[in-house]
Amino acid sequence: MKKREYANAFFNRIRELNLEPNLVVFPRNQPQLINSRYVEVVKGFRRSEPFEAFVPGEIYHPSFRYSDLIALAKGVDAKLVPRPFTGQMIVEGVVADFLQAIGLDPSSFGGTEIRRNQTAGPFTVSVARDVSRLINNSGRRLTDVQARRCKRKLTPYLQEKGLADTGYCGLSNALARQVEKDWQRDNDVFAQQVWQKPWKEVFAADVGREFTPNDFDIAKPDERTQTQRHQTVKEIMASVEDIMAYPAAPTI
C-alpha cells in the first residue's frame, strides 16, 4: 500500500464504487512489532537466523515508519483512521476494533472475539528454525509454495501432539529500549499529528515494558523439552522432505 501507484489504483476503485475511502491503520510499538515479525517469518520457514541477528536488518523496515502514513493518506485523499495496536487491543480483539473504526457494530458479527493469529511460542519457533537450518545446511532452499505447505503442516502437528505454545519473546530490556530510542522521534511526530498526544502516552503500557527472553537459543529449555524438541524436529523434517520431493515454484 505504501507504493503510490498501488495506493492510487486501490482508492480510485473505491471512489468508483461511490464509497468514501478510509485508511485504517494499526500502529504498534516497534519492539513488540519486530518480535512478532520474527515469529511470523520463522514460523513461515522463511528465515532461520537468531533473533539478535534478525533485528539489525529489520529495525529500520519502512513499515515501522508510521509518519509516512500521514503523507500517504493525504496523497490519495483518504481519511486516516489510526488505531493504536496495544496489548489491551490484543485482549479485547482487533477485529471488533476494526469494525468499530469503519462504523459497524461488532455485535452484529459472530466470532469477533476469536484470536486467529496468536503469536507462536518458543517451542514452535525453535522447531521451525531448526528445520530451516537443516534445509539451509544441506544447500537447499524452499520455494514459496513449499514454505507455505511446511507452515500448514507445522501448526496442526504441534496441536495434535499437545506441543503448540504461544508467547515467544526474543527481546531483552536493553534491545527493546534501543529500538524505542531509534524510533522515538518519528513516533512522536506521528502521534502528535493524529492523536495530539506523545507516543508514550498512547502506548503507556507498551513503552518501557520489561522483557524476559524465552528464545531457546538464549534460555536453554530443560532436558525433557529438549528431547521433545529434537524428536519434533526429526518428524517435521520427514514431512518437509516429502514436500520438497515435489517440484514447485522458484525458490525463496
What are these regions (language model features)?
Residues M1-I252:
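Anion-recognition interface
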